[in-house]
């Protein structure tokens, strides 16, 4: 298994290692959460802690299939902990498989000298009553598939002579799922792997978890969202589309199904914001897919829809860097991404190529009604700097690889 140090995440997790807070890592299936647990173990060992102090359980491993309830898990841990002297470290992978897991975790936290790390593939892992039960005694870290920079760390050794442009083309179709490095990013095996991953997410994290009976409807909705990443649409417009396919579905049902997909981290919803009225708009959100390589594997057409895929890539990079993101509207103009991190704003427009005066005017003109002094970017595949009027133009590769934006 090829592993890289995911320092962006470790930097955020490191201050909480050894504290009483429960460390929770969430994200789409197979995005690298288990590897994060291994990286944390490595750091603990390097700090002088013996691996004999570790208790690790992967709840998708058949060896632990008997641990299906909070009581059985609690009994197992207390039995194993009795054999360990001093503080011990708990690593639970895919804990959502255990019924009422939060009761066990909270009991372990308050009654034993332990440091707890858990992963899960569902955004609702810590929602509502679960969060209340844990009493805010946790910190959550969302883990994403590889960024372009992380992809390069593993792809460069495989194709050392390829120019950066070719590397980016490979990323456009392969995406950032970590395991692809183990099959050397070869096209056919990668596509097969990603298709299998998609099926696992759909079956285990969406259908099974939410007890969905109409799988055909779910598949149609997923196909529609995948085809329309980065475009605004409403549940009503999707209901009309399905009606044309002889499926009559209430908009509320559609919204529920899309929410289940977002809970499984297959999609991310981006709300629209009226920048003049400073309010979130109630309809016509955009959706992006967790990994554009999955889109290529199950739907195809990433190069055909390259403008949408570039948007998808930039959006995920903004999330990785901890920005809160909305789509901005000012009058009749729309800004792809309005980004906020601790009160510091950033605006980003994404285009394929600035190949005509009309395109240049549209992309740069999106900022005409924005009067503040926060950084404004237009990002595209163009190689030459076309910055103007205080608006910065960046090649998308340079933008993605920059350590910081200012």
Predicted regions and their residues:
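Hydrophobic positions on the alpha1 helix immediately C-terminal to the Walker A/P-loop
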Residues: 36, 40
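Catalytic cores of nucleic-acid endonucleases
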Residues: 328, 352-397
């Amino acid at each position: 298994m090829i592993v890289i140090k995911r320092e962006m995440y470790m930097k955020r997790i490191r201050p909480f290692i050894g504290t009483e807070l429960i460390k929770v890592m969430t994200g789409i299936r197979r995005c690298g959460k288990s590897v994060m647990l291994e990286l944390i173990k490595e750091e603990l060992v390097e700090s002088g802690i013996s691996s004999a102090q570790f208790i690790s359980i992967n709840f998708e491993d058949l060896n632990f299939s008997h641990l299906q309830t909070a009581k059985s898990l609690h009994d197992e841990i207390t039995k194993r902990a009795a054999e360990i002297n001093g503080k011990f470290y708990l690593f639970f992978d895919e804990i959502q498989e255990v019924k009422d897991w939060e009761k066990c975790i909270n009991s372990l936290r308050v009654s034993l000298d332990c440091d707890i790390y858990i992963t899960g593939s569902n955004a609702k892992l810590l929602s509502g009553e679960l969060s209340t039960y844990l009493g805010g005694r946790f910190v959550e870290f969302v883990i994403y598939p590889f960024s372009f920079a992380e992809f390069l760390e593993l792809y460069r050794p495989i194709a050392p002579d390829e120019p950066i442009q070719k590397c980016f083309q490979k990323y456009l179709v392969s995406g950032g799922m970590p395991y692809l490095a183990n099959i050397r990013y070869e096209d056919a095996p990668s596509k097969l792997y990603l298709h299998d991953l998609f099926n696992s997410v759909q079956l285990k994290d969406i259908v099974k978890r939410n007890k969905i009976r109409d799988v055909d409807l779910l598949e149609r909705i997923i196909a529609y969202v995948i085809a329309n990443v980065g475009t605004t649409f409403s549940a009503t417009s999707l209901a009309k589309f399905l009606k044309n396919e002889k499926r009559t579905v209430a908009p509320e049902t559609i919204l529920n199904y899309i929410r289940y997909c977002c809970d499984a981290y297959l999609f991310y919803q981006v709300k629209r914001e009226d920048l003049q009225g400073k309010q979130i708009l109630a309809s016509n959100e955009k959706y992006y897919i967790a990994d554009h390589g999955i889109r290529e594997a199950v739907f195809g057409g990433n190069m055909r829809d390259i403008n949408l895929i570039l948007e998808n890539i930039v959006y995920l990079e903004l999330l990785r860097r901890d920005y809160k993101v909305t789509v901005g509207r000012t009058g009749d103009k729309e800004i792809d991404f309005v980004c906020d991190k601790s009160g510091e704003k950033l605006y980003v427009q994404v285009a394929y190529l600035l190949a005509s005066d009309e395109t240049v005017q549209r992309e740069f003109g999106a900022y005409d009604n924005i009067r503040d002094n926060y950084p404004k970017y237009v990002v595209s595949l163009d190689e030459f700097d076309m910055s103007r009027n205080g608006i910065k133009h960046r090649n998308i590769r340079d933008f993605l690889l920059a350590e910081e934006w200012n």
